[in-house]
């Protein structure tokens, strides 16, 4: 793609997200979401491959449907209540419709079916943008409208997403489809705690972005698209294979890695709020996700591809454009757990 065109599209991505962040009026927020969607479509379709075009079409249709639902809900609220402010969403029909529309935009269960199919047709770098940056604007709106939404609906969507995010990845062999179930499960944890501790939701979102970026970048450096090709990683780059396994375990929420922090704090907060059953169900669904992360780790580190070469394995990475962000995100994805006391004091949990 022409660098000037790419610069304009990436600037539009940033503009759309910032516009939604800064909006207090539904129409401006909707415009920001639409700028975001229209800016990423050429980036998704730049490969000129039938799978990429199919993924782009599916993404456009789902995002257009969600945007139409948001516009319908905000117009209905303005008609019934007389308010266009995001914080003044009060009618039950409008709140439920907006919640379902935002769930569709984010890929939360039970309206998640488009996400694995879309990510399967994309390159890993574009998939990273879709899994991180494109989640920010809808999630900002969800945080703003969360106080007006029925808590039972939020908890149900959260638990269903954690279950689907773990269950859906069990029978997958394509890494991009497995990575698609990753945001479904993690965003489910965030929605679960959204009404009780918004600051904890923001912490979880930040760590999710760091860990997801690290996972996508390591797999892109490994040039792996299926579980079988992961077995060749150890002979190509042992250091990167070990780091990838640790990042995946962090995503699964195992101590002493960074991914354990948000799960631990969320379970603690749910118990404080008198929801031990929800906390237990969320912890049990996390085991499903952990199982397929362990499958990937097994393929990465315990399965060595038949190799008759006598050449020594390269332990040092070649310096490329993604080496620095890969290093930073990997360090943060692995070593932030000791900061938990400072984080809890800062968030006053």
Curated annotation (Swiss-Prot):
E.C. numbers: 7.1.1.2
Record-level GO BP terms: mitochondrial electron transport, NADH to ubiquinone
Species in which this protein is naturally found: Oncorhynchus mykiss
Keyword Repeat: no
One term under GO cellular component: mitochondrial inner membrane
Protein name: NADH-ubiquinone oxidoreductase chain 2
One Pfam family here: NADH_dehy_S2_C
Coiled-coil portions: none
Subcellular location: Mitochondrion inner membrane
Reaction equation(s) it catalyzes: a ubiquinone + NADH + 5 H(+)(in) = a ubiquinol + NAD(+) + 4 H(+)(out)
Main localization category: mitochondrion
Membrane topology of this protein: Multi-pass membrane protein
Transmembrane segments: 3-23, 66-86, 98-118, 139-159, 178-198, 199-219, 240-260, 274-294, 319-339
InterPro entries, alphabetized: Complex_I_Subunit_2, NADH_DH_su2_C, NADH_UbQ_OxRdtase_chain2, ND/Mrp_TM
Native organism taxonomy: Eukaryota, Metazoa, Chordata, Craniata, Vertebrata
Keyword annotations of the record: Electron transport, Membrane, Mitochondrion, Mitochondrion inner membrane, NAD, Respiratory chain, Translocase, Transmembrane, Transmembrane helix, Transport, Ubiquinone
Enzyme class: translocase
Assigned protein family: Belongs to the complex I subunit 2 family.
Recorded GO MF terms: NADH dehydrogenase (ubiquinone) activity
Function of the molecule: Core subunit of the mitochondrial membrane respiratory chain NADH dehydrogenase (Complex I) that is believed to belong to the minimal assembly required for catalysis. Complex I functions in the transfer of electrons from NADH to the respiratory chain. The immediate electron acceptor for the enzyme is believed to be ubiquinone.
């Amino acid at each position: 793609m022409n660098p000037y065109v790419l610069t304009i599209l990436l600037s539009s991505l940033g503009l759309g997200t910032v516009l939604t962040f800064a909006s207090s009026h539904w129409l401006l927020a909707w415009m920001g979401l639409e700028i975001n969607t229209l800016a990423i479509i050429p980036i998704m379709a730049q490969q000129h491959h039938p799978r990429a075009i199919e993924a782009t079409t599916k993404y456009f249709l789902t995002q257009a449907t969600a945007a139409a639902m948001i516009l319908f809900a905000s117009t209905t609220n303005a008609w019934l209540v007389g308010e266009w402010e995001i914080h003044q969403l009060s009618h039950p029909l409008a709140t439920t419709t907006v919640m379902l529309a935002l769930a569709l935009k984010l890929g939360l269960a039970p309206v998640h079916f488009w996400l694995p199919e879309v990510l399967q047709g994309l390159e890993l770098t574009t998939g990273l943008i879709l899994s991180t940056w494109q989640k920010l604007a809808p999630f900002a709106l969800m945080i703003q409208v969360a106080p007006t939404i029925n808590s039972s609906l939020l908890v149900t969507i959260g638990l269903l997403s954690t279950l689907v995010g773990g269950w859906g990845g069990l029978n997958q062999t394509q890494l991009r489809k497995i990575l698609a179930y990753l945001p479904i499960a993690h965003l489910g944890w965030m929605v679960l705690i959204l009404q009780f501790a918004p600051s904890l939701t923001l912490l979880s979102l930040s760590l999710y972005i760091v860990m997801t970026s690290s996972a996508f970048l390591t797999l892109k450096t490994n040039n792996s698209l299926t579980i079988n090709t992961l077995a060749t990683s150890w002979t190509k780059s042992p250091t990167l294979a070990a780091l990838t396994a640790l990042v995946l375990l962090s995503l699964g929420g195992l101590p002493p890695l960074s991914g354990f922090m948000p799960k631990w704090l969320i379970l603690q907060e749910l118990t404080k709020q008198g929801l031990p059953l929800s906390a237990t169900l969320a912890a049990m669904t996390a085991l499903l996700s952990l199982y397929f992360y362990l499958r990937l780790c097994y393929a990465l580190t315990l399965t060595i591809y038949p190799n008759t070469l006598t050449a020594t394995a390269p332990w040092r990475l070649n310096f490329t454009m993604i080496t620095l962000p890969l290093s930073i995100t990997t360090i943060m994805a692995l070593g932030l757990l000791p900061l938990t006391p400072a984080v809890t004091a800062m968030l006053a949990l």
